[in-house]
Amino acid sequence: LSEKLTLKQKQDEEYPKIIRSDSILFACTGTIGEKFPLEKIKNSLPNLVDNIKYNQNKLIWMKAASGIKTTDTKPKLAMSECKIGNTPIKVYGIAKGSGMIFPNMATTLGFIFTDANLSSSILKNILKDTIETTFNAISCDGDTSTNDMVSIFATNKANNSEIKSHKEKKLHD
């Protein structure tokens, strides 16, 4: 196993994947009155791309959740495993936000990831059906902000059976 993992890492380093610019998502809640640091981000991109690793360890989700904190005191993350049919599926979520949280999210950013094989339209409908009783139900201090976002992504790496509707029973069992 050790030799296989070492070989895989070497292959990833020798044949890096190309990341298209339209595959990068930026999210920011910002501080009222402060200009978005576009130049700082633009100048940091080459270093970020050079340091991407394709074989991350289990701590990657903690690192990601910690990386998006602003005034949060702790990283916010969750992980769950379930099945679509007989296929095991993983779902991970990370979020940031500690103040100015009121229904409709305010300064909360949430990112949900799954390895399930689901189309973007299925993901969109799942998120739409669940957002009102989850993220949009959060209240911290009664203040709202103009910056909010929850996104859902599927890598489609799982080999689950095709899902044709977000209402399918096998998604809810």
Task: For every predicted segment, state its role.
Residues 3-10, 14-135:
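Glycine-rich, mobile lid/loop segments that gate access to catalytic sites or pores
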Residues 130-137, 149-157:
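Membrane-embedded hairpin module used as a gating/binding unit in multi-pass transport
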